[in-house]
Amino acid sequence: MMDTIIIRDLELFLRVGVPEDERAKPQRLLVSIEIAHDFARAVEKDDLRSSIDYAAVCQRLAEWGAGRSWCLIETLAVEIADLLLREFGATTATVEVRKFVLPQTRFVGVRVTRHANPHVS
């Protein structure tokens, strides 16, 4: 059984876009994350150290993106999911990135899901 931590609409300002002028300055993105993790041990002990600290996740993502740029939000979403698996011990990470670049739409976005590889030590 897996449990899920949900972070909805984390506001990040990152450089992303295919045209260079779009990447010239950080733009507002909303990032939503679902992190699967077994909470049984955390609940048993009522101890954050056995869970995933969602405040630490938010802080890490804010710092991680500083000074970087991406052409595709697809790449950004996959890199965030990989970071959650690698650094926070998520079993599964689903990441949705929304950007507000086309005036005729409310937003454009992508959603990716990545799973930890149980065969990697």
Outline where the language-model segments fall.
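N-terminal, polar/charged subdomain of small-to-medium soluble alpha/beta proteins
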Residues: 1-121
